[in-house]
Amino acid sequence: MRLKAQILGIKAEDFETEQISADDAQYTGRTELYIPEEMVKEFKKKGISTENLYQSDEEGNQFLPELHENEFVILTPDQSAKKTLLGRVSGNKVVPLAFKKSKPYGVSPRNVGQYFMQEALMTSAEEAPLVILKGMAGTAKTFYSLAVGMEKVYNNPTGEYRRVIVCRPNAQFDDDIGFLPGDEKEKIAPLMRPVIDNLEQILDSDEKRRYEDEEELGDKITEIFERGIIQTEAMNFIRGRSIARTYLIIDEAQNMTPNQVKGIITRAGQGTKIILLGDPQQIDKPFLDERTNGLSYAAKHMIDSSLCWQITLSAEECERSALAMDAIKRL
């Protein structure tokens, strides 16, 4: 439609119903609150009511901001600000993290955002069937999602998931991959190289499973794919299916349209967990922007859903090299 309008010299605009507001775009899934010092022990045992928590304005007035279901919280004791506590909004309470001490496939959180991300990913599909992770490149979204997937499927083959499926929208080519040579796996191989890179890092980072050389590591990755523990599929082949008991990672979801995201989420089968990953500020798809892409659209409409957990990783939580961070800021 845009192309037709451009040819005819007519201005084309997005549907207002598919745009998110500037305020919605700023929702990060996390907030900071103060907790009375005397209630710290109670929080650690069973959580506390949100009525006991507060923020302070510049004049020192205390107030409780609007909180959303499953919003993550950094709690600071009001008498000892040096040590913070991590929790999550559940109904009218803030409860402590259940998986704070977990190390999925030997991976440990390195910052607050990764603790929150781990909590959302490790929680069962019954309680958290949809997880939305936003953040710039280098915040370990794909890495951590794969690590938890490996923990849930490879280390626990009789557990809740039968497999890990990874998809990426085809932003580099045309929407239809049919014109590319080879079978489905050969067609999507260029899109999935980042998945292999992250998997190599995960496998090689576990001290209990260190591999002696590149060949041994490559053989292990081949085994994982041949056994169907991790599968990669084109987005075109996912839509229309009902996938059960699957840990489904949708990488680079900011390059999907709202309709594509809706088509994926509404077809989730029993026991399936869907993880949407991406950076709304890094869009490669023509005609999509920060406010009209599928990732932002889903994040907006799933706020306050008890079945959706979402978190935005900050730039300070990027785990890439100092050069990469400096380039991101300068370029």
List each language-model region with its residue ranges.
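Conserved helicase motor core of SF1/SF2 NTP-dependent helicases
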Residues: M1-K45, K101-Q118, M122, A128-L130, ...
